[in-house]
């Protein structure tokens, strides 16, 4: 098992806190955005970041028109198909999740690769979790991305995300009770 999703799943299994926050170690996110996410975690089970707000995209950040609009339109497709909260970025890896919500999500994680993030979003929608997406700073990356550094690879990843989203939409219509929440006392 290897890849972004495999690393996330392993980290989630080993995390011990009541709130679990995830950020890639490539320098693209600012530490003070964690404070914003924590503030929203009082009211929401899952807080996702969005890197698509122009004023928070720093010079040198890898968020050109292709990636920005690709992430935006795939997010809007997800929002439309599932009638969810406002979504503007399916690829942002900065997120915060409450332990109880994570315990409900974990049995349904199946993706080890680069589109694990959108799977987590779809599952949190299907499980009717209280979630929100908030704008975060996005800065220049340290090192080269093997995914977003190549437009063709990013385009193919976008198509895989769309296929996965459509698959979940179809499965949720055919078996609407497939994604129950655990009951806790």
What kind of region is each of these model predictions?
Residues 27-29:
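Acidic metal-phosphate-binding loop of nucleotide-sugar-dependent transferases
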Residues 2-14, 19, 31-114, 141-156, ...:
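Acceptor/aglycone-binding surface of glycosyltransferases and processive sugar-polymer synthases
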Residues 80, 84, 127, 168:
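Phosphate/oxyanion-binding loops and surfaces in catalytic or ligand/nucleic-acid-binding neighborhoods
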Residues 139-141, 171-172:
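C-terminal tail/cap regions
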Residues 118:
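DNA-recognition element of transcription regulators
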Residues 85, 108-112, 121-139:
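Catalytic donor-sugar/metal-binding loop of nucleotide-sugar-dependent glycosyltransferases
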Residues 160-185:
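C-terminal, non-catalytic tails of nucleotide-sugar-dependent glycosyltransferases
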